[in-house]
UniProtKB/Swiss-Prot annotation:
Name of protein: Thiazole synthase
Regions annotated as coiled coil: none
GO aspect biological process, one term: thiamine diphosphate biosynthetic process
Annotated EC: 2.8.1.10
Organism: Geobacter metallireducens (strain ATCC 53774 / DSM 7210 / GS-15)
The family this protein is said to belong to: Belongs to the ThiG family.
Reactions mediated catalytically: [ThiS sulfur-carrier protein]-C-terminal-Gly-aminoethanethioate + 2-iminoacetate + 1-deoxy-D-xylulose 5-phosphate = [ThiS sulfur-carrier protein]-C-terminal Gly-Gly + 2-[(2R,5Z)-2-carboxy-4-methylthiazol-5(2H)-ylidene]ethyl phosphate + 2 H2O + H(+)
Keyword field: Cytoplasm, Schiff base, Thiamine biosynthesis, Transferase
Length: 260
């Protein structure tokens, strides 16, 4: 058993890597490029607000990303209303970025938790508009089911608040979400180190998206490689099937044939 032929499928598109990474907070564009390479990711999320899409004569973040190698996932980071998020997605599509989008509609600046009411509103509009929508949402099975029913291609519940590095705070609701929806479940936000990514994947989620966990590390390139390995290891462990947890010991060697 390996992860080689274990593909992540989103809206009919196949990806070999189950790790998605962001492009913000790096010390330089060169460091970002090296970290992307080390991560092994194929889907790269880009904040539309950070991309110069109006004046192509000026330097843009996209100048540093090989779009033949990576699938761009424009995101609506910084949007607090459905209207703003929809407008941002349409601008990204008109600029030729992608019609597969990571939809974020935030509730406030303190927690960066999603405003689910506005999120559902935006998702309905974008799906009708022909977008492939991957919404960042709270770890609420009911909201995730509503997003699936709207037509979202995946759901992306948070593991913990964005940039917090707190890891997977509520694995139980993540498991319920996986039982509730049929679309891919991608844990988004809160991953702080490789063990967090492995834990998420061991739960059986389809993928993990992160930015700060890599870009904010002391050595982002090394951490990108660690996250790459952790996601693969966690996925393989999930497919292999862990032993059940129990209170008492079980001998690993048989008692038959012992010397008397």
């Amino acid at each position: 058993m390996s992860t080689t032929n274990d593909k992540l499928i989103i809206a009919g598109r196949e990806f070999s890597s189950r790790l998605m990474v962001g492009t913000g907070k790096y010390a330089s564009n060169e460091q970002m490029v090296a970290a992307l390479e080390a991560s092994g990711a194929e889907i790269i999320t880009v904040a539309v607000r950070r991309v110069n899409i109006t004046d192509r004569s000026k330097e843009s973040l996209l100048d540093f990303i090989d779009t033949r190698k990576y699938t761009l996932l424009p995101n609506t980071a910084g949007c607090y209303t459905a209207d703003d998020a929809v407008r941002t997605c349409r601008l990204a599509r008109e600029a030729g970025m992608s019609d597969m989008v990571k939809l974020e509609v935030l509730g406030n600046e303190t927690t960066l938790y999603p405003d689910n009411e506005e999120l559902l509103k935006a998702a309905k509009i974008l799906v009708k508009d022909g977008f492939t929508v991957l919404p960042y949402t709270s770890d609420d099975p009911i909201i995730c089911k509503k997003l699936e029913d709207i037509g979202c291609a995946a759901v992306m519940p948070l593991g913990a608040p964005i940039g917090s590095g707190l890891g997977i705070r509520n694995p139980y609701t993540i498991r319920i979400i996986m039982e509730t929806v049929k679309v891919p479940v991608i844990v988004d936000a809160g991953v702080g180190t490789a063990s967090d990514a492995a834990i998420a994947m061991e739960l059986g989620v389809d993928g993990v998206l992160m930015n700060t966990g890599i870009a904010g590390a002391q050595n982002p390139i090394a951490m990108a490689e660690a996250m790459n390995l952790a996601v693969r290891a966690g996925r393989l462990a999930y497919r292999a099937g862990r032993i059940p947890k129990k209170l008492y010991a079980t001998a690993s060697s048989p008692i038959e044939g012992m010397i008397e």
